[in-house]
Amino acid sequence: MRKILIVIDMQKDFVSGILGNAETKAIVPKVCEKIRNWDEDCILYTLDAHEEPFYSTTEEGKRVPLHCVYCEDGYYLEDDIQAALMDYEDARDDQEKAGRFDSVVKETFGAVDELPYMIEKCMPEHPFQIHMVGVCTDICVISNALVLRSAFPKVEIYVDASCCAGTTPENHKAALAVMKANCINIINEE
């Protein structure tokens, strides 16, 4: 069965910047390893993107500091993640296998239209599995997992808990429990 890997918001502001924490930094090597070892045809990664003055008028903007400002440093992928994606592409080229990665830019927690569309582009034939990693477990990972659960009711979805981090360890665990309750498979949970 074919599989697609979705890497959620592994951007500088979420990992080592304004919204980062010890847990988000700690998962970077695991996420890089997962990307480099991905032996399937497609990886998608989301990019949270905000701009003023619009952001400050949103509910998120009223509660969360401005982050991932489009085309500023914090918007871009963490350097190690970007390098892992390039290694994935190079390895696929060396093996003469198809392999690609692409971005999905989103302005809110869940990429409601964009992510299902891009998955269908990458995986036009069913059945397939969706595998997810990234940050923040309790915000964008869960939001996108639930979007995909609704968009693809017959597809198995897996979230690798060891490659996710939340705003707090408690929120991470709570989000995993909610995803389990919504028929999302949680793997590598400690």
Regions found by a protein language model. Give the residues of each.
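Active-site acidic carboxylates
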Residues: 1-100, 124-128, 154-158, 167, ...
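Gly/Ala-rich phosphate-binding loop of Rossmann-like dinucleotide-binding domains
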Residues: 149
